[in-house]
Amino acid sequence: LVLDPHDEYYGRTGLGLKDHVERGAVVYYTPVNPPAGARSLKINLSCIKPDHFQGAIQLSDPQRQCLFAYYRKYKKEWIRSILEDKKIEGVAFHEDTIAVVKRRLIGLLGLDVENGVVVGTQGIFDVVAGENTITEICSELERGKTVIVDTSYFAGAIEIMIGTIIVSEMFDKYRYYKRVGKLEDKPVISIVLEEA
């Protein structure tokens, strides 16, 4: 897994892994104008879990508790539920906590919200597209492919979050494989995280 903050590994504008003899083992995800054979980088909001924010943004204990409470109650719809002011029976958060959480989610995820409803997105996070992106990336890594994710358009927090989403999904899969005795059959996955 290569998280590429300079968009240089694939070789969109020059030589790169796309020109390697084993280019069939290279998969490239980019958020803007994917070249032929590349894939568009979109991640559906329903794929995001509260843990994915760790390291990307600082949250107070009440804010973190808010994220986890909404995730436990609303599962894949937890982000929308916060934005739509849905309540959790028997649980109350200070209105300032909810307001800060909303602002942080809207800002970090690039959401356009009107009256609590997501009406559009400005980045890679989406309400319609991207439901299978993380699953596909993980499957390609499991098959031994080199997956390059172009993070050159993002601030550090988003790059960290993208990496966290992918790696946590892979870790969960590999933990399952270990439990059922299939880990030995899986490839070791290396992660290249280059600083910009």
Describe each PLM feature range:
Residues 2-196:
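P-loop NTPase motor domains
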